[in-house]
Amino acid sequence: MKNFIFITCSAPTQSLAQKISKALVKEKLAACVNISSPIQSTYSWKGKICSEKEFLLFIKTKKSLSKKIEKRIKQLHSYECPEIIALPIVQGSEDYLDWITTQTL
């Protein structure tokens, strides 16, 4: 299971979230990307407390592709410092994990 990761990334608009998700899947960097309904994010940025509507991407992929995904998200994203957080997948359906392998580089 240590070969698979789950990456989260937030985007300010649904259209940007879709643009990122389609690029990652088309380029075989991710097997699947889910996009949440709008969420409310509160954060500190440049000394100000901000609260914005965002769309959260849930990216399923192989650990070996994490740096390529980070680079691609940064190329497409409008934020100066986009959220890109990877978590290991510690357990999952063997069939689903095999599918991730067949759908990615």
PLM region descriptions:
Residues 1-105:
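Positively charged, small/polar-rich N-terminal and surface patches that mediate targeting and assembly
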